[in-house]
């Protein structure tokens, strides 16, 4: 069963690689992920609380003070 699963996943990856030109799929996936993350959660405004996994609108978190910059 494991061998069949590995062969199936390999075939899927080869099919996907042939469908998209080199580099195009990677950038499309990043844009899609970025868009989905912005839709599902808002960003934390300046001086808002942040931590190890910050979601600051500016993408900068002062880790010592735990506030968005």
UniProtKB/Swiss-Prot annotation:
Expressed by the venom duct. Disulfide bonds join 43-57, 50-61, 56-68. It comes from Conus lividus. Belongs to the conotoxin O1 superfamily. The lineage of its organism: Eukaryota, Metazoa, Spiralia, Lophotrochozoa, Mollusca. Its main location: secreted. Residues 18-40 form a propeptide. GO terms for cellular component: extracellular region. Residues 1-17 form the signal peptide. InterPro entries: Conotoxin (IPR004214). This is Conotoxin LvVID. GO terms for molecular function: ion channel inhibitor activity; toxin activity. It comes from the Eukaryota. Keywords: Disulfide bond, Knottin, Secreted, Signal, Toxin.
